[in-house]
Amino acid sequence: MSFSNEMKVFSGNANRPLAEKIANYLNLQLGDCEVGRFADGEINVRINETVRGHDIFLIQPTSPPVNENLMELLIMIDAFKRASANTIAVVIPYYGYARQDRKAKGRDPISAKLVANLITVAGATRVLTVDLHAEQIQGFFDIPVDNLWSYPVFAEELLKRENIVPEETVVVSPDVGGVRRARRMAERLGTSLAILDKRRPSDNVAEVVNIIGEVEDKVVIMFDDIIDTAHSIVKGAEALKNAGAKRIIACATHGVFSDRALERIENSSIDTVYITDTIYHENLPEKVKVISVANLIGEAIMRIRKHLSVSTLFR
């Protein structure tokens, strides 16, 4: 006797609008699951439909408030495991704690590894995420991890909205660590590549020391994975403007926007900022545009479900 395991998609509270778009792409309704709080603030998860023997895709970015959303995710995984789900694939569009992926100095924790351990022990059987800050985090897990790249989504949108002339445009990596990410975008758009050489005197503070590449009289596309406080991207834009950049467009997968980041962006040399909807925001300024990665994630889920290649999405 053979059984076809039904697929169901559920969402926590972190980014329900994105989860609804993903479910819509898959021609599914979001599963009925309540994630609330007890009187003392503890998280309460109630699954209101059967999931026994089903393949579950659970959508929950661990964005700010990071600890609240992470605990929601862990408790939801545990609830589905104890309800006898066949598989539990967690879709974490934004992976919190990803920047704590190594010991930068003595006695530092490696929190990204701890989070990976927690997700695995809770009962996840697969992880799907978007633009991990450090791709080696995939190796922190002993379960399959699919790290989706957002650059095709950005490239398609930029070609639609901006007058991109490859010979007059340059993609800029905001630091040496982001060169591979920026190179993918440059190859997609057919542009040249430049790099900002930065130094970090302290956390969330960066100083541009040198610009490697030609940016004078060019439209600059700064491409990064995260905008947090926006100190780095604003300082970078200022250096590029001083070097003769004609126009500055910033693209970042994850708009965290901590500590007056939006105010800094509004008052900066950046003309337009593009982010994705991995993190939910309301009432963003006119300068900030949101591109959805729902179809990208939805297609990846469909391919995983059908045992098809995910990597061919980026060829």
UniProtKB/Swiss-Prot annotation:
Its cofactor is Mg(2+). It holds the Pfam family Pribosyl_synth. The keyword Metal-binding applies. Pathway: Metabolic intermediate biosynthesis; 5-phospho-alpha-D-ribose 1-diphosphate biosynthesis; 5-phospho-alpha-D-ribose 1-diphosphate from D-ribose 5-phosphate (route I): step 1/1. The active site is at residue 198. Keywords: ATP-binding, Cytoplasm, Kinase, Magnesium, Metal-binding, Nucleotide biosynthesis, Nucleotide-binding, Transferase. It is an enzyme of class 2 (transferase). Binds 2 Mg(2+) ions per subunit. D-ribose 5-phosphate binds at residues 200, 224, 228-232. InterPro entries: PRib_PP_synth_CS, Pribosyltran_N, PRibTrfase_dom, PRTase-like, Rib-P_diPkinase, Rib-P_diPkinase_bac. Mg(2+) 1 binds at residue 133. SUPFAM superfamilies: PRTase-like (SSF53271). One of its GO terms (molecular function) is kinase activity. One of its GO terms (cellular component) is ribose phosphate diphosphokinase complex. Its EC number is 2.7.6.1. It catalyses: D-ribose 5-phosphate + ATP = 5-phospho-alpha-D-ribose 1-diphosphate + AMP + H(+). Its main location: cytoplasm. Belongs to the ribose-phosphate pyrophosphokinase family. Class I subfamily. Homohexamer. This is Ribose-phosphate pyrophosphokinase. The gene is prs.
